[in-house]
Amino acid sequence: EIRARFSSAMSEMYRDEVPQYGTLIELVADINQRTLQAEPELLARMQRSGELARLGVERHGAIRVGTAAELSMLRRLFAIMGMEPVGYYDLSVAGVPVHSTAFRPVGDAALLANPFRVFTSLLRLDLIADEALRAQAAAILARRNIFTERALALIAQSEANGGLTDAEADEFVGEALETFRWHSESTVDGTTYDALHKAHRLIADVVCFKGPHINHLTPRTLDIDAAQAAMPERGMDAKDVVEGPPRRDCPILLRQTSFKALKETVRFAGDATGAGSHTARFGEIEQRGVALTRKGRALYDQLLAQVRDMGSAGSAALDYGSRLAQVFEAFPDTHEQLRRQDLAFYRFTLSDEGAALAAGEAAAAAASDLDALIARGLAQAEPIVYEDFLPVSAAGIFQSNLGGEEQKQYAAHAAQQAFEADLGARVHDEIALYEQAQQRSIDQLRSALRGQATKVAA
C-alpha cells in the first residue's frame, strides 16, 4: 500500500529533521501501553473493532500551500495513495488566514489498514490587507515549483495506467517526499521575510520557502492528559491547554496538544554574512473519540460557545479547564446515552449469541429494532472513531506554534466554493461519511441475520 510506505517514510524524515518528534513517539507508546494494561475493557473493545492494529501508525501530518495549482496537484498526488479531500475548514474566523481540507482514506477497510491523513491548508492571499505586499507574495509563489519533475511524471503515469508498479510506487514515495522536506534556505531576503512575517507569521511560513514543509506529525494517544503532564519531564515545552472537549469517560471528537514550535536557523536569499530564524515546526499528540452526529455536533458547538462566552477560549487562563468541564456536564457521557439520543455514530455487529440464533429467532431478530437487539445481547455497538478535525482546535494549535497570541480578525467568510474550485473537486461531507458507515453496519447486521435464518432453516 503506497499510503503506508509514504507515511512510514515521512515519519523517518521528520524524526531526522526534528529529533524531539522521536521522543514524542516514545512517550506516546509508553502511555498507550500503560493505559491498555490499566483498562482491559478498552483493550478488548479496540481488539474487536480492529483499532488496536492501527494505533501505532502516525495519524496525521499538516502542510500549508500557497496557490490553487499547488493544492490541485496535491489532490492528484494524494489520490495515488487512496486519500481524498474530506471536510472544509475556514480558519480565518479564528484569525488564521487559511482554509483547509483533510486528505484521508474514506472506506472502512482503508482506514483500518492505514488511517494516515494530511491536513492541508491553502493560504488566502485576499486576507493580506496591504495590496503591494499581497502582490509581492503572489509573485514569489508564482515563481516556485514544489514538485519534482519525476513526481509530476509519475502522477500522470499513474492516472493514465490506473496505478503504479511496485518499483514505481517506491520511486513515487521518494519523489513525493521531496515536496514535504524542510529547507533552511529561504527564497526571499530578510526584508521581505520580515514584512510578510509582520502581516502574519503563517504567511511568512508559506511564502518564504521552497515548498510546503511538513510542519507537524501526530501520533495517537489513549490518554492525552497523561501525555500533556509527561511532556515537560521529557524536555518538551508543552502548549498551555489541551484543545477540544474536556476529559470524559466516553471521549468525543478530538483532543490535541503539542510541544511548542522550535526556533530554527534559516539563511535568507542574498545574505552571505549571517543567519535568521524561523518558528513553525512542532510535534503534536491527539486523542480521538467517537464521531458525533449532526445533532451531537450542534450540542458540542453550543456548549463550546457557552465556554467562550464565559472567557477567552484556548487561553491559558487557570479556570479554562474548569469552565470547560462544568459546561460539558450537559453532554451525556455514556455510550448508551450517546447512542439512544442519536448524538454519536456506532458500528453494529452480531454478538456471539446473535450468531448462534436458530432460524426462527434469527428471522425475527432481523426485523427487530437495534435497541431491542442490543438489550437482548444479540448485537453490540462499537463507537465509530472520529477521523477528522476541529476548526477551533486546529486554529488554536496553529496560533500557539506560530509564536504569539495575536488573533487577527478576518471577516467571517467561509469561501468553500472558491476553495473547491482551486482544489479541482468537491470535498466530502465528513458527517455523511459517518452516516454511511453506520448504515452499512446496520445493513450488514440485518443481512447476516437473514442469511443465518435461511442457512439454519435449510
Q: Which positions does each model-derived feature cover?
A:
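Extended, well-ordered protein cores
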Residues: E1-A458
